[in-house]
């Protein structure tokens, strides 16, 4: 017996919320590693990136599959399209976290980068997601 469409959407909502929290943690770790010059933290961010991206891609494909199988109408269609768009936005945020980590890992200088702008950017991103 196939799942009800509402159950599928609720499941996707939970998954995207969990992924959003994980991405925010990764972004904050990346900024912390960058500001304190801790390369091991940045390596952890890069390591976790592959799993996060795979989960986002599978959620996006699951949304497209639900779109094809259930042929939702207006309200439900908007929910699915929002989930697909959120996956794309979260993926971009995750890519930024990884890029911040790569900047530190490729840097030849060891100094304390107490950059108020990058910390502010991370906190604003967190506010947007929550």
Curated annotation (Swiss-Prot):
A Pfam family for this UniProt protein? PhoU
Domain of life, per UniProt, equals: Archaea
Under the heading SUPFAM superfamilies, the entry gives: PhoU-like (SSF109755)
Q: What InterPro entries is this protein classified in?
A: PhoU-like_sf (IPR038078), PhoU_dom (IPR026022)
The entry's protein name is Uncharacterized protein MJ1011
Taxonomic source organism:
Methanocaldococcus jannaschii (strain ATCC 43067 / DSM 2661 / JAL-1 / JCM 10045 / NBRC 100440) (Methanococcus jannaschii)
């Amino acid at each position: 017996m196939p799942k009800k469409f509402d159950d599928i959407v609720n499941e996707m909502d939970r998954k995207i919320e969990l992924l959003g929290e994980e991405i925010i943690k990764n972004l904050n770790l990346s900024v912390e590693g960058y500001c304190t010059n801790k390369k091991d933290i940045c390596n952890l961010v890069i390591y976790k990136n592959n799993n996060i991206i795979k989960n986002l891609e599978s959620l996006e494909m699951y949304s497209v599959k639900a779109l094809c199988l259930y042929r939702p109408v207006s309200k439900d269609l908007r929910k699915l399209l929002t989930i697909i768009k959120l996956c794309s936005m979260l993926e971009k945020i995750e890519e930024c976290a990884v890029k911040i980590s790569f900047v530190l890992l490729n840097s030849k200088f060891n100094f304390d980068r107490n950059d108020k702008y990058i910390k502010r950017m991370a906190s604003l991103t967190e506010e947007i997601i929550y």
